[in-house]
Amino acid sequence: PEILARIKQHELAYRMQTSVPELMDLSGESDATFELYGEEARQAGSFAACCLNARRLAERGVRNIQIFHRGWDAHGNLAGEHGNQCKDIDQGSAGLIQDLRQRGMLDDTLVVWGGEFGRTPYCQGRLGKDNYGRDHHPRCFSIWMAGGGIKPGITYGRTDDYGYNIADADGNQLKPQPDKHKWTPGTMHIHDLNATILNQLGIDHRKLTYRYQGRDFRLTDVHGNVAHEIIA
């Protein structure tokens, strides 16, 4: 069985590599598609081109697709840097969602846009009018999701008035942030986010385990609740 598995692995690698030239050739895409994603989609390696390629990968059955976009770590010159970053990702992101919708793929595709932390509500650095930064802030941050059975056009969760801590529905700060041992509706711990994403992929986060150093682990540790309030 091990030899047969290795043979299949090499065969899969061959099929994947030989499919790349056709996948990356965007010459067959219509002008309307490039208008949707933006003219930068014609430029290889641009964020818009990556979004277009993400749709093409999804069409070919690729189950997990990740797009990277660097340059958000603005400890200085945040106003200029984040403004340019938003311009870079805006049309490509919107184009991807619209393209998936018009092709009937959005209901079966979950788009998650976010990072590993947010930025502090207070400034750092030179503190000039046009040149200031913000530090890392893992206590609370925002992401957005589209498709994949998630309710459109809603917001979920809130912070305190300073944007520093997670708060309950009445705006009261939660300690800890939030309590991963106690489910508080309207808030989302990172374990809850992972549990919800897995749920939309048809996976029960309580049953999915992997073995490491002789022990079974869950991606959500021993915590996590599915946020049914955001599921359509």
Predicted regions and their residues:
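Ligand-binding pockets and gating/stacking loops
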Residues: 1-232
